[in-house]
């Protein structure tokens, strides 16, 4: 039986990945794929910039004429051998003593800066000026005369440095008025509720001005950075805003200014960039940026007391209230991040700064006299805003952290066990009182459904319980007479862990772009607790799976939980018992 072999059918050539034609300059600058649409691509149309396409570009590669000129020049320079440098003798043989070379030795960073400054000023002569002002030839050993031209032995350092600076310069992003308004609205709709430090009327009054201070310009782009980060439509342009804002803030920090000249907008911009970096860059970068804001606050905001005068001009009250809110936002960020890292907080809770007023009073320019933090911690105090609730839970978080650090250093300072129990009962009493007051004002269904800020605060309350139990379990020995209290608190921590899992399951019903940006912090601490105390097949195992699944769903919007997720994955792959370690 004859077999018929079918000839292979011609296959269509794969479609090219890019459309024909050249990409526009804006897409090339941003390293994005251009759709090559005419007369404007979609990116340029959305950004409001001119769509410019350059088709005639200079040819690249080696240039024969230039190579010939360089070869002729080098031949001319080496055509006449001198007595000091015969052609058959290497320039750097074993008989040349290199120890006598007069190369500049850099003792510190200031010397290096001086050398670079001198090199730019003397690049035409090919010498480097030391601090003493003596010219040192680039590579000429002592007592020898070189016939090699300086132009070949010492490149133009100044021109190289200038070229690098030009490459690193970041142009101010240009966007249309429509996109600007959209980014402002996104910020106040999705970010301001978590960071209520901006007075909207004041912001828009200076934002629309053609001339702004450097600090205001940095704050504007920091706001747009966060606005773009919570928008699926504009997230591709947020990085250019971030780079421009950060470069401007670094330039401001490098200026030699007096201690009392820090602008409010400069501190606010650093805080906003820190939040963005925690979410989208990495923890270390965000922690350093937050530290810059903390130091600026410490320089000139914590001196004196917050007075009783409500008769000052309206603009003065608004600025003072913005400073209060900016400080308390930094205070909360400081304590929540310290809970994650285990490091001591930067700010003390004993500050003479009044609590922020209700949001309605703030935005409507209605001055009201608020109390201090000690007043809000009292058992019978009714708290008027979720921002103040956040400050209270941050304060108790800091006390729990300080309690643990004192226990770890107890052997060095001969701390007695009685001191531990006194501190624990003091913290636990205020924790129970404020947690009950919070639950009475905001029922559980309200915490789960309407307000991501309330959900975050509720998670933090229960995380403090887990934190206190871990401290007890590590410090109290098994033969202690109060070991029964440890067992009782373990039951309370198990219930708190289950409540955290229940609250976490509600995250799937929320828009991920509206979730509190620091939500991975309590979730990470809960995962560490469950990893430490779970046994295969027990109830903690199911809780661990649920909470890690929720964290994976938030992975796209926040980088804060990456390390603990990796820790969980490593735990699944290993059969050795888990040993606790600090995860940053």
From Swiss-Prot:
Residue ranges forming the DNA-binding region read: 24-51
Question: Can you supply a Gene Ontology BP term from the record?
Answer: DNA-templated transcription
Would you tell me the Gene Ontology cellular component terms? nucleus
Per the entry, induction is: Deletion of the conserved eukaryotic csnE deneddylase subunit of the COP9 signalosome leading to defect in protein degradation results in the activation of the silenced dba gene cluster. Expression is controlled by the transcription factor flbB.
Signal peptide feature range: none
What are the subcellular locations of this protein? Nucleus
Region named Disordered = 1-24
Basic and acidic residues composition bias: residue spans: 1-15
PROSITE patterns the record matches: ZN2_CY6_FUNGAL_1, ZN2_CY6_FUNGAL_2
Q: Extract the InterPro entries matched here.
A: TF_fung, Transcription_factor_dom_fun, Zn2-C6_fun-type_DNA-bd_sf, Zn2Cys6_DnaBD
> One Pfam family this chain carries?
Zn_clus
Q: Which GO terms describe its molecular function?
A: DNA binding; DNA-binding transcription factor activity, RNA polymerase II-specific; zinc ion binding
Keyword terms of this UniProt record: DNA-binding, Metal-binding, Nucleus, Transcription, Transcription regulation, Zinc
Looking at the record's lineage, which domain of life comes first? Eukaryota
PANTHER family, alphabetized? C6 FINGER DOMAIN TRANSCRIPTION FACTOR DBAA-RELATED (PTHR47338:SF3), ZN(II)2CYS6 TRANSCRIPTION FACTOR (EUROFUNG)-RELATED (PTHR47338)
Its biological function? Transcription factor that regulates the expression of the gene cluster that mediates the biosynthesis of the antibiotic 2,4- dihydroxy-3-methyl-6-(2-oxopropyl)benzaldehyde (DHMBA) and its derivatives. Probably binds the conserved motif 5'-CT/CCG/AGA/CG/CT/A/CA/TT/A/GC-3' found in all dba cluster promoters and that shows significant similarities to the binding sites of other fungal C6 finger domain transcription factors.
What protein does this entry describe? Answer: C6 finger domain transcription factor dbaA
Q: Which organism is it from?
A: Emericella nidulans (strain FGSC A4 / ATCC 38163 / CBS 112.46 / NRRL 194 / M139)
